[in-house]
Amino acid sequence: MSGSHVILIRNQQEARRVLEEIGVDPGAYPYLLPKASFHCIKLKDISFRGANIIKQEMLSKGGEAAIARQALFGKGSGDVLLMGTLKHYRLLINKLKVQPFGLKKVATEIENILVALEPKQQIIELPHGKSLKLGERTLIMGILNVTPDSFSDGGKYLNSDQAVKRAREMIDEGADIIDIGAASSRPDSVMAGADEEIQRLLPVMDKLAAQDIIISIDTFRGEVARAALENGAHIINDIGSLQLDSQLLPVLVEKQASVILMHNRMQIRTGEPYRDLVADIITELEDAIGHAVEAGLPGDKIIIDPGIGFGKTPGGNRLLLKRLGDFRSLGKPILIGASRKSFIGQTLGLEVNERLEGSLAAVAIAIMNGADIVRVHDVEASKRVATMTDMVMQENG
C-alpha cells in the first residue's frame, strides 16, 4: 500500500484545506472547490413534469437525479433525489430559474440549502444587552426544573434558594445558558397554570439577576413569556413551535426575543403517523419558522430543536441523532435535548438515574452531526465531552 485512501470532505473549508496541503495553485481554487463537495439533496412533492425537467437538466450537467418510475408516464407529484457536486448544483440552479412548473422556487430552495450547509459563526442579539455567539464551540444549556413532577429532577429545586444554588453550580461547571422550566411537559403530569408557572419562575430569576448568565425560559405560554422577558429572561424555549398558545408569538415580536422552536406532535397532532420522520419534522419546523418571520420576528433570532422524546419512537429518536445533519438545510442553529430521556433507558435497559453514559453518547453524536447547543442535566460531564468533541471536529487535516 502506498498510503492512498478515501478522504471525507464535508464542506468547502475542508476542501480548501486539502488543496492547500497538496500545494495546488490558488488560481485553480475557483474551478476545483465546487467539484470537491458532493451532496445528495432530497426535494419533496415535485410535480412529475417538473421532476422530468430537473432530471434532464441535472444529467446534462454531469450530475444525477432519481425520480419515481410513474413520473415518466403519469400526472401527479413525488420526491426527487439530486446527486451532484457544488458545480453541478450551481449550473442546475441557473437553468431552473428560467423554467416553468414552480421550478424557480425549487432553484431558490436548493440555493438556500447549499448556503446553509457551509459552517458559519453567528451572533444572536438578545434582550437586556446580552448576545449568544454560535459556531465557535458547542454551547451548554443546563436544565433547571422548578417543578414537583419533571421526569428526572422533579421536586428537587422547588425552593428558590435550592434552585439558585443549583444554577450557580451549573454555571461553575461550564453552562452557557440556564434553561428554567416551571411546568412539566411529561405526558402524565398535571400542567401548571400560567399564574403558578410565573410564581415559580420569578423568585428564581430575581435571585439570578446578578449572575452573568443567559437565561432561557421553558414555556409555551405568552403570558409567562412576557413576565419572564420583563424580569430578565433572554430566550424562550417553546416546546410547541408557536402552536400551543397564539399569544406567544406577539410577545416574542414585541420583545424581539430569541426563541427555540421545538418540534412536538404529542400535544399538537397526537396519533398522526409520520410518512418520513426527518422530512416531516423539517417541513413542520420550516412552517413554524415561516410563521414567525411573517409575523415580524427576525429569522436570525430563531433556533430549532427536532424534539427528541416528543412523539417519537425510541428508534425514531436514535434516527434523529444519526441524521441531525439533515436539519442544517433549514439554516438555523440546532439545539438537541436528549439528556436522560426514556429512549436512552429503553435502548440500554436503564432507569432515569443510570443514563449518564447514554446521555453523553448522545451529546457527542449530536455535536458531530451539527448541534450548536446541547441541553443537559449533567453539565460538568457534558462540558468535557463537548470540548473534546469540538476539538476533534475542528482539527485540521
Language model feature labels by segment:
Residues D25-K35, A65-K75:
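Short, flexible, solvent-exposed loop/turn segments with mixed acidic/basic and small polar residues
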Residues S2-Q13, D45, R49, I53-Q56, ...:
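Active-site-adjacent loop and "lid" segments of alpha/beta metabolic enzymes
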Residues M1-P34, I53, I93-K97, K105-N145, ...:
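N-terminal amphipathic alpha-helix/helix-capping segment at the start of soluble metabolic enzymes
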Residues M58, L91-P100:
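Short amphipathic alpha-helices in soluble, non-transmembrane regions
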Residues Y31-I46:
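Short glycine-/aliphatic-rich beta-strand segments at the starts of folded cytosolic domains
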Residues K165-G181:
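Catalytic domains of carbohydrate-active enzymes, especially glycoside hydrolases
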